[in-house]
């Protein structure tokens, strides 16, 4: 999604003469992480195309969005090494993390040391620097939080029940079961809640979800709606009172769903995974809870149910933070300035 924003950005494309090559080998989400002869053949073709286009264009700067670890990193290692062999100036932009989890492996450490040498790096948020600190001097790092297009806030009718929204793929590691357990705690306390899960079924299936909800007697207050997009998705955001995202997903860096929730003036409750603490201001725009902690989730949700004025104030503060830092225009201008700085630094 962020790559498309950059590709389509008038601000960036008017500032530079841009040429784009798609380096993705996966056809869809289910294809990510899988190998095969087809991908090897396509990768070989990609390398030839990169070499050809680089010779033809002679760019001032090559911008690459690599993967942090595993087979996908090994592929991107070859791409960056090819560009280095061609004496190109390179900036890499990370939308994922996990380097620090592999840096003590001899082979990976060797590759990372070679990969990051003489590179400029763009990170999504300040605290993600710890992931690359072993290999990259901070002077070579640029911070560029993501941004999203703005939408109109539509008025909604008051609801009797307090509406909780979870918006993401139905993956266990996104904290689905933790939120379900928190809802069970709140129901036992007699809190009038409605919790809506919106997202594509994944390692949590629809049948499994319904089975758990029925066993915990939550079918009157917990609902799953499957994947929703565009206006249908926006309708859930506009009707919610708070947004809850208790993720412990390894690759979580800078969830755009939090920005979408903040734009709609929703207080956000999430974890300290990845760059999330740089998005949510603790106690001001929402709360950060410990991972795997349904009890903490329930306590924070209950607090916002019992303090509607504070809930509204947090939502307002989140909206203001979104407008100040996380609009697409802010992101595009940050990227433009960073790319200009990178080009200038390589000329020194």
Give residue ranges: language-model regions.
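Conserved acidic donor-binding segment of nucleotide-sugar-dependent glycosyltransferases
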Residues: 282-283, 287-294, 303-309
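Acidic donor-binding loop of glycosyltransferase active sites
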Residues: 238-252, 266
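Short hydrophobic beta-strand element within catalytic cores of glycosyltransferases
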Residues: 263, 267-270
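Conserved donor-binding/catalytic core segment of Leloir-type glycosyltransferases
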Residues: 156-174, 179-185, 195-201
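Nucleotide-activated donor-binding/catalytic signature segment of Leloir-type glycosyltransferases, i.e.
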Residues: 208-228
